[in-house]
Amino acid sequence: MVSMLTNVVSGETEPSASATWTMGHKREREEFSLPPQPLITGSAVTKECESSMSLERPKKYRGVRQRPWGKWAAEIRDPHKATRVWLGTFETAEAAARAYDAAALRFRGSKAKLNFPENVGTQTIQRNSHFLQNSMQPSLTYIDQCPTLLSYSRCMEQQQPLVGMLQPTEEENHFFEKPWTEYDQYNYSSFG
């Protein structure tokens, strides 16, 4: 062992045969050295590091993860049920993060930790205006046509029933008129 260290310290590359065999036969460890890198100084270092960092790691958003095939999935934990709520799969990480933010605001209100806290006020205004334009359009037109509350209620009475609503058939109407059996009364009383 001492002779091996002497060889290493003195710079000899080949140890003597006696030193190798007296220590026992061990596998030699191969050492690899990387070729020396050119020394980069100043702002070139930061630019190179920034460019390599931006290529390696996309920005991470709360509640968002990337699927192996490249799409972005968003989910949030429901604080009331202690379960995960699936928000969907999105083309971009930003879209998934915005879906998370909307759900976080719905679940936690003003205490929510958001990905885009600076957009809270503008999102609410845009969402409300979009909601009013799309879903409240029929009601708004009736309000415009009926200036007073009384005339509005009369306008609402004159509306046609919703398309797609099923009206009960004659047989179904008679079903509800049948008297209850003792079994029906027992079941109803156990739930009430």
Curated annotation (Swiss-Prot):
Region Disordered: start-end pairs: 1-20
Listed GO CC annotations: nucleus
Species name: Arabidopsis thaliana (Mouse-ear cress)
Pfam families assigned: AP2
Source lineage: Eukaryota, Viridiplantae, Streptophyta, Embryophyta, Tracheophyta
Gene: RAP2-6
Domain of life (superkingdom): Eukaryota
UniProt-recorded name of the protein: Ethylene-responsive transcription factor RAP2-6
Inducers of expression: Induced by salt, heat and drought stresses. Induced by osmotic stress. Induced by jasmonate (JA). Induced by salicylic acid (SA). Induced by abscisic acid (ABA). Induced by ethylene. Induced by infection with the bacterial pathogen Pseudomonas syringae pv. tomato DC3000. Induced by the bacterial pathogen Pseudomonas syringae pv. maculicola ES4326. Induced by wounding. Down-regulated by infection with the beet cyst nematode Heterodera schachtii.
Family in the record: Belongs to the AP2/ERF transcription factor family. ERF subfamily.
